[in-house]
Amino acid sequence: MREDDEQYFRRLESDLDTALSVAREARKRGGDPTEDIEIPIAKDMADRVENILGIDGVAERVREMEADPDLSREEAALELAADFANDEVGDYETRAGKVEGAVRTAVALLTEGVVAAPIEGIDRVELLENDDGTEFINIYYAGPIRSAGGTAQALSVLVADYTRTLIGIDEYKARNDETERYAEELSLYDDETGLQYAPKDEETKFIAEHMPIMLDGEATGDEEVSGFRDLERVDTNSARGGMCLVLGEGIAQKAPKIQRYTSQLDEVDWPWLQDLIDGTYKTGEDTDEADADSDDGTDEDAADDSDIDDSSAGDEEADAPSGPPRPDPQKKFLRDLIAGRPVFGHPSEPGGFRLRYGRARNHGFATAGVHPAAMHLIDDFLATGTQIKTERPGKAAGVVPVDTIEGPTVKLANGDVRRVDDPEEALEIRNGVEAILDLGEYLVNYGEFVENNHPLSPAAYAPEWWTQDLAAAGADVQALADSPRVDLEHPSAEQALEWAERYDAPLHPEYTYLWHDLDVERFEALAAAASEGHWAETDGAQQTRPPDGAAESTLVVPRSEPVREALEVLLVEHTQGEETLTVPDAEPLVRSLGLTEGLERTWDELSTAARSYDDGDNAVRAVNEVAPFEVRERAPTRIGCRMGRPEKSEKRDLSPAVHTLFPIGEAGGSQRDIAEAATHAESMQDTPGEVEVQVGRRQCPACDTETFRARCPDCESVTDPRYVCYDCNIDVDPDESGRAICPNCEREADAVQNRTVNVHEEYRSALSNVGERENAFDVLKGVKGLSSEHKVPEPIEKGVLRAKHGVSAFKDGTVRYDMTDLPVTSVRAAELDVTADQLRSLGYETDIHGEPLTHEDQLVELRVQDVVLSNGAAEHMLRTADFVDDLLEQYYGLEPFYDAEDRDDIVGELVFGMAPHTSAAVVGRVIGFTSAAVGYAHPYFHAAKRRNCDGDEDCVMLLLDGLLNFSKTFLPDQRGGRMDAPLVMSSRIDPAEIDDEAHNMDIVSSYPRAFFEATREMADPGEVESLIQLGEDTLGTADEYRGFEHTHDTVDLAAGPDLSAYKTLGDMMEKMDAQLELSRKLRSVDETDVAERVIEYHFLPDIIGNLRAFSRQETRCLDCGEKYRRVPLTGDCRECGGRVNLTVHQGSVNKYIDTAIQVAEEYGCREYTKQRLRILDRAVESIFEDDTNKQSGIADFM
């Protein structure tokens, strides 16, 4: 580690220590559940693992194994299992306890001690009996095991089996009905919830038959299995979500990875894994069915792979036509298309985004670079941070603005074709755009292909590749780059032709058109039209050839449909007249068509090979046959994509939002208003403000005072829970595990009671304690009841101050703000709305080139734990800082800490960053702000939270708010209650301990020519890994925190729209109209297919689901909220006499039916789809039609 990096971390930890000292002093004085700060510091992964699990001795052993460079983390998990079996780690008296400790620790280790899976995803481990009397291990998994990922899920089973063998427990021997139950259950869970990988029934049965550990779990979902119910060793008839995840996404999907480790263990033998991997487990009927499926699939594959077949034929006959290498189109991203979220390109369709390799400074780690002009031209549906579902290389990506790639090409209403590289120009012309011919380039870094193990797709022929080709041809590229008269990226047409001819190099990309999208027939038509055209000066005068040294050579050709279409397909900028088409800078185009400067053809006929290349749909071979220079494929790979989630920058509230975790039952009304509860009385005889609620039963250890508060009202000592057995009415002391078992009846005692609380006194006392009046806020909201184990309420004083400053409490007492995650490795002070002086005060002394930092436009490399907040987050943090200062001053009696008057005062302050599925917070430092609705941070910061940037969103908390107000006592006592809670904090990020996806990000300033050439052959990414430096290459070196170079710059991190149109448009109908209108404009999109998919995946399921819900609905009292299966006969609520109403209304059932029918007709959907809609329409009409009898008159019968 470099000295300046060490200084950075020392500064962070010094600021953290200052905040910790203030928080410690404050918690001694207030009414918090404990006097200690409840978020322990973990300086490394070993600390996190031990703190989350609470198992002494684990951290020391993990550090020993981490120090061994030859020991992988998976192997370390197995070593730890042996330690648990041999009583070297942990203090477990039972064999089941040892297995449980080993499994939990293995999952914690494999997830870097960050996610909640080890404590929430594994409920318990127990010993059961086989039919032969032997014992076996049964593991109860729960839903939160999902956050561990498939590898950790699968290895948890292997660790359990390994531990089992070491302590002498037999294997699980599945009964036949249990095997069948597993198969039915996985199918049910996949239909109801969905699995990333859903094994077939025969595969599931095969795994269940051979699994040495019984996989069990808690019931999830409402659906129950129809067969194999009420089994003796299975507690529920519902699908067990945790078990399904481990068996499907773990064992079945990760079998090859498990086999790698079973082969290293003498004690564990899973020979059946090879059959699972090879698919040789099939027998009988299933084999026949599988063969039939395979036959069907082979025909499809053969159709898709026709190009490959042609290519192989080319080996036999040298001149045989063949197509260029191309990745197969993938349609998976189009599944589950939602109304209002547009498709930007069908799979690999011309006109869609063009793949370009590289990494911008705000790019990488599952993001996609898009030109800001393209964002505006697609009606602002894409903004910074918007998620897109993409064809390749991954499943999804977060959008980032990159203005150093090519922008979109559009056709205007007057017929002109123009490329747009300026976002301001895009805004000016977008109302006049008739069609979007091309969406521009789509930047993807090489590391994404490594991470997804996706074969490299052919690269766009970009300037960075061409300059290396030019250098290989003998040019002094460095001298050209240094010359003020030469622009290597955007040269003049004359210069581009000179280079091509002098050095025998390929034509510059600026003048290399998309010949691979043009068929040979239209190529010939364009060549013929060009030969019939003439050169014109800008004033329209006709010339036979362009003058020597002319700055612009304008070609005028006769207008015809084939010629116009050819120019549009090639993306040649031109203007359209009544009878002519005018092309500026046309000399490279003319020469590419095989014409002389005098517009004379140099060829008569194309060869058979050129005419037949790629079935005549690709003119690249024809161009290279007639042009006097080499012409490369400009954009061979198109990437289909559609909009996913919109970007997010919003405060995190409970639903509904509350200010304090203090229970008031129903007394606060629908608003949960504490002031209303303070005056509430059930009857005239009741005392106003007295409310019966369920709270903790606690006792002061110093003076024996009984109370429900965390602190004794008499002596202010921290109170302890008092456990009482309801049946025996005796006090029970808890054991070491915290469970209180009655010695008489052996039932579990609890420390909860129903008690009458005088809310009026509590409320008035709280206002008095902090010196506030009721007019300091509009409303103070509490909760109806507490969901924590001991039901300890939070002091109302904190809620008063939150309400005053307009912030709310989360489930653990903290104040949070959510933002979409995006990466950035270098920043400018100007775009962060800070000054160079402010950055220098934070330790940024030099820019990325080593020059002293003096100006706001200099690029500086971002420190690993520095974060950039959205404007919304900055305002929220400012309000939170005011709340914390008032809390310190008015409640704890200390000096204010932040004294923040505006958001500049937040710069340099520490925050917690945290992902929803984890239990570990990461300390960060604010260095600036952005107008985009996202949170920018170093990729390693996001990876430390076990997140990438494919559209994920995480929260930030002001550091001192978390230290003062977080308490485990407030966390819900239910499955998943400890997820999304900072049970531990990481004060320093170790790159070696974060999620390894971030290690696959490339950190170079340019890609070598050999890499680009390898993409033409669609090489495996591993074959070129030695050519490009990745983050993992610097681990353990002095540069592991530095040197994150980029290939592309961008002018502003927030370029393009601040918000996606999905968030600014009105109702769903308005969004869908905009979606379909955009589909009509995009050349790469089939609007009929979009309409069909919206109806099939959104409208039809919604209408059918709402129709079913209407028939099964409950009714609800509008006053007290009481629910009934049917409306009481009186029509009034039995509890309060209020009006009872439906919970599902006619409007929600038929809201989409008319629109769906209209869309199906307008966009020419299949007759099958139209018939389904008509049938549904009749079903809806039959339910809601007015069938009351009308009085008939005699005239009705005449």
UniProtKB/Swiss-Prot annotation:
Residues 281-332, 534-553 are annotated as: Disordered. One of its GO terms (molecular function) is DNA binding. It comes from the Archaea. Keywords: DNA replication, DNA-binding, DNA-directed DNA polymerase, Exonuclease, Hydrolase, Multifunctional enzyme, Nuclease, Nucleotidyltransferase, Transferase. Residues 286-319 have a biased composition (Acidic residues). One of its GO terms (biological process) is DNA catabolic process. InterPro entries: PolC_DP2, PolC_DP2_cat_dom, PolC_DP2_central_dom, PolC_DP2_N. Possesses two activities: a DNA synthesis (polymerase) and an exonucleolytic activity that degrades single-stranded DNA in the 3'- to 5'-direction. Has a template-primer preference which is characteristic of a replicative DNA polymerase. HAMAP family: DNApol_II_L_arch. This is DNA polymerase II large subunit. It comes from Natronomonas pharaonis (strain ATCC 35678 / DSM 2160 / CIP 103997 / JCM 8858 / NBRC 14720 / NCIMB 2260 / Gabara) (Halobacterium pharaonis). The gene is polC.
